[in-house]
Amino acid sequence: MKTYKQVFSELKRQKKTALIPFFVIGDPDFDTSLAVVKAALDAGADVLELGIPFSDPIADGPTIQKADIRATRSGMSVTKALDFIRRIKDYKDVPIGLLMYYNLVYQYGTEKFFRDFHQAGVNSVLVADLSIDDANEIMGPAVSAGLDTVFMVTPNTRPERMKLIAAKTTGFIYTVSVLGVTGSREDLSDTVAGLVGKLKSLTAVPVCVGFGISKPEHATTVARAGADGVIIGSRVVGLIESNLGDKEGMLAQISTFLAEVRAAI
């Protein structure tokens, strides 16, 4: 199974930045979701961030909330998500991170969840509603299962907490470019470069930037700031929503957009 370290090291040698799209598993249905993720990989995605739909996604804006609703209505479950990930890994071996909420982990059984998903091909699990203060609750079982740890840093994170987060992260640091929930934005925050620079001074762990990246130019700005990866969620999930009646158009638009971002970084 390909690791974050392998992918980020190889891209660094090539002077490239990782393209990391985010999708909700099962949006709008299992088969279409599978085709979408495969199209993203074919367009140049280096790493995947995938969400398991949840009823109360507090960190997400309306675009991803609606994706959660569509996926839930299509019958997506934790068990089906395992099958989905196995199929993706059979298609292409890239690192996969889950971005999700603790209740889903807890209901399934924390140790069993991490073990089963690592065996299916997941490299890390980022629990959006657990802070670094609660990290010990998941770090032990996650590391025991063979998973890397991923934590979030925001523009408001204090330097001492950045150091703590950096020390506990083994996969990559998910750097939130703007305050608030996920969603496409017209302009990227001018604090990104400073935030990436601070983190780079604290850790050798890869630093990836997400939230609000909606254009190839945004991705270029993030890459030039020194980030190791660019995470794009709402923009590509929005292309699913706007093409629900046209699967071929959906796949074509997602492929074109991600290929443009790949070329920009």
Spans of model-derived segments:
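Catalytic beta/alpha-barrel core
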Residues: R73-G75, G121-D134, D148-T157, T182-R185
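N-terminal amphipathic alpha-helix/helix-capping segment at the start of soluble metabolic enzymes
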Residues: M1-I20, I85-K89, G197
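Glycine-rich phosphate-binding active-site loops on the catalytic face of alpha/beta enzymes
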Residues: A45-D56, V122-L126, S131, T175-G183, ...
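Catalytic cores of alpha/beta
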Residues: F30-A40, T157-A167, V209, I213-V230
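Alpha/beta catalytic cores of nucleotide-metabolism and tRNA/nucleoside-modifying enzymes
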Residues: A81, G197-T203, C208, S214-I265
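Glycine/Thr-rich beta-alpha phosphate-binding loop at enzyme active sites
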Residues: M152, M162-S201, L239-E241
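Hydrophobic faces of well-ordered beta-strands that scaffold small-molecule active sites
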Residues: L19-F23, L48-L50, I96-M100, V125-V127, ...
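Active-site beta->alpha loop and helix N-cap motifs at the rims of alpha/beta catalytic domains
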Residues: V47, I52, Q65-A128
